[in-house]
Amino acid sequence: MHEKCVFSSDTERNLKMNYTKITEFNGTPVVEFSAGGYTAMAAYELGSNIIRLHDDKNGVEFFRFNKDNSADVIRQSSEVWGLPSLYLPNRFADGILKTSDAVYHLPVNEKAPYNNHIHGFLQKRAHTLVEHYADDNCAVVKTMYRYDENDEFFQYLPIKFTAEFTFTLSECGLEHKVKFTNLSDKMMPISFATHTTINSPFVDGGKEENIRLFVPAEKRC
């Protein structure tokens, strides 16, 4: 039995607007979920990527999204679409990862002249859909990935763990919770990030030539 969402507001709601459903997006199963005026799609077999987040009231497409993208396009370039979740993000020089009890040699996937391991592997794996549901306050999708010797990356990082993801849509927007559980007797390195890709233009029907980017400069070098 799942817990109910705990958001509350004086805003009038239509219960029929809150839903979750399994559907397909260009060759991959997704959970479409909607609540609080937002609609999103969780592609659990594409690394639990939230490949779309849309503000239905204001016509805003938050993440980089292309309705014609195939699953293979997203899978091959998962870091540049939607909201991918990265375990071991950023760069490890020469692929070397040191913990308090071991030194691991990760595969170098950013070649010369950089010679780094970059962004890990979790965003490229097929995750498992645990559950999805909606109530009068929100819509929730839960997924997980179990990392063990069946993963080809295990030869480089032999530390069993589970990664659990909870995505909640409400009038507050999208909430993203992540839980890692170390299933080994070794020290597990923890480094996690979302590689958020922002859509341009934001607004449905917007034009790129109308976009202005303002970056505050506090110090001139």
Predicted segments, located by residue:
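Short, Lys/Arg-enriched N-terminal segments with co-localized hydrophobic residues
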Residues: E3-K16
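Surface-exposed acidic/polar loop and edge beta-strand patches at domain peripheries
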Residues: K16-E175, K179, L183-C221
